[in-house]
From Swiss-Prot:
Pfam families: Trypsin. The lineage of its organism: Eukaryota, Metazoa, Chordata, Craniata, Vertebrata. The active site is at H73 (charge relay system), D123 (charge relay system), S217 (charge relay system). Residues 29-268 form the Peptidase S1 domain. It catalyses: Preferential cleavage: Ala-|-Xaa. Does not hydrolyze elastin. This is Chymotrypsin-like elastase family member 3A. Belongs to the peptidase S1 family. Elastase subfamily. Residues 1-15 form the signal peptide. GO terms for biological process: proteolysis. Residues 16-28 form a propeptide. Its EC number is 3.4.21.70.
């Protein structure tokens, strides 16, 4: 549902080290593939209530037993939410799922987030769960990078989510993944790429073949560590309004390492 789109200056919010990625190729996330079940065990589905049923709207990452990080544009005070942990196939109850209600007063959007200016940055929010997650094989905590950490150009990261399979396309049932190499700020901020739209508190990844799309918003950009693990370096924020995988418009993420202090302060005070 969410994932900000920007056409040149119009974006669209994509409102989108554990287990090896699957090796087969198909066409998902926008030219991604089905993830190995529960291979990204910090991935969550943020769902909103409508007419008595809940529907997937955004992704998120479990960063503490009772805290999830997602995108600011995923949060509306007018909606009722739940978080589903241990999810893989949205259409089937498979057993590991943990459904946790969210209290509206436990939604913490970054104070500088401006819904009318996605390109201004600060597209990040924290959700305090109404009860702690039960950790296990299918539900684990994400690791976050150190404050200020910047990934080198072409770092091979993975986006994960249940976003549309292509622009205006269908939503998948199974969790999707796609390999998105990091595009550093020097390249991503070129005038014929994202220009001044992209800020240093963001991270770009991917290209015109693989990208995030609507429904991936808030989900993680998972990047490898030297010890064989993974860190969540990005929160999926926006793509071009011309299309989810438009040339010279890589997917843009909120750079998690730019907000470590805010994350730690918010959790400590609540």
């Amino acid at each position: 549902m969410m994932l900000r789109l920007l056409s040149s200056l119009l974006l669209v919010a994509v409102a989108s080290g554990y287990g090896p990625p699957s090796s087969h190729s198909s066409s998902r996330v926008v030219h991604g593939e089905d993830a190995v079940p529960y291979s990204w065990p910090w991935q969550v589905s943020l769902q909103y209530e409508k007419s008595g049923s809940f529907y997937h709207t955004c992704g998120g990452s479990l960063i503490a037993p009772d805290w999830v990080v997602t995108a600011g544009h995923c949060i509306s005070r007018d909606l009722t939410y739940q978080v589903v942990l241990g999810e893989y196939n949205l259409a089937v109850k498979e057993g590991p799922e943990q459904v946790i209600p969210i209290n509206s007063e436990e939604l913490f959007v970054h104070p500088l987030w401006n819904r009318s200016c996605v390109a201004c940055g600060n597209d990040i929010a924290l959700i305090k769960l109404s009860r702690s997650a039960q950790l296990g094989d299918a539900v684990q905590l994400a690791s976050l990078p150190p404050a200020g950490d910047i990934l080198p150009n072409k770092t091979p990261c993975y986006i994960t989510g249940w976003g549309r399979l292509y622009t205006n396309g269908p939503l998948p049932d199974k969790l999707q993944q796609a390999r998105l190499p990091v595009v550093d700020y020097k390249h991503c901020s070129r005038w014929n790429w994202w220009g001044s739209t992209v800020k240093k508190t963001m991270v770009c990844a991917g290209g015109y073949i693989r990208s995030g799309c609507n429904g991936d918003s808030g989900g993680p950009l998972n990047c490898p560590t030297e010890d064989g693990g993974w860190q969540v370096h990005g929160v999926t924020s926006f793509v071009s309004a011309f299309g989810c995988n438009f040339i010279w418009k890589p997917t843009v993420f909120t750079r998690v390492s730019a907000f470590i202090d805010w994350i730690e302060e918010t959790i400590a005070s609540h």
